[in-house]
Amino acid sequence: MELNYNRVHLCGQAADAPVLSHINHGCAFYRFTLSVLRLSGQADKLPVIVPKALLDAVPVAAGDTVTVIGQLRSFNNKSGQGSRLVISVFAHQLTPGGESPFNQIQLSGVLCKTPVPRRTPLGREICDIILAVNRRYGRADYLPCIAWGAVAT
C-alpha cells in the first residue's frame, strides 16, 4: 500500500435525510448519518459529507440502504461548539443499495506522536495512534486510531 492512502468503503442505512452542511468555493455540501451494524449488533453512526452534485445524481432519504466510497477526513472546529476534532467520511461515490452492513477503511500515513499502549478496563491490550494522511493542496487529515490485540503491541 502506498504512503498517504485513504479509502473508506461503507454500506448501511441512512439514519437521517441529508441536510446542508456548508458551502465552499460555491459548491454545496450535505451531511447525513450512516448507520452500519457491527457483528455484535451494535451500530456505528458515521457522519458522511456529500457534494450536492453527487447527491443530485443519487438521492438519499432516511432509511435508504446506501454504499459509500470515499475518504476519512478531519478538521479542527474552532467555533467552540461541539467536538474540537471533527471526523467524517467524505463521499466520492454513492450507490443505492448494497450488501449491508459493510465497514472497511484502509489508511497509510505517518505517525504524528509516539503510540500509547494501554489496557482497557476489561484487560484488552490496545494502542492509541495519531496518523497523518497527506492529501492534495498541502492539506493533511489527522486521524486518531486504535490498534487492538497483537497489533497493539
Question: Which positions does each model-derived feature cover?
Answer:
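Single-stranded nucleic acid-binding surfaces, predominantly the OB-fold ssDNA-binding core
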Residues: 1-153
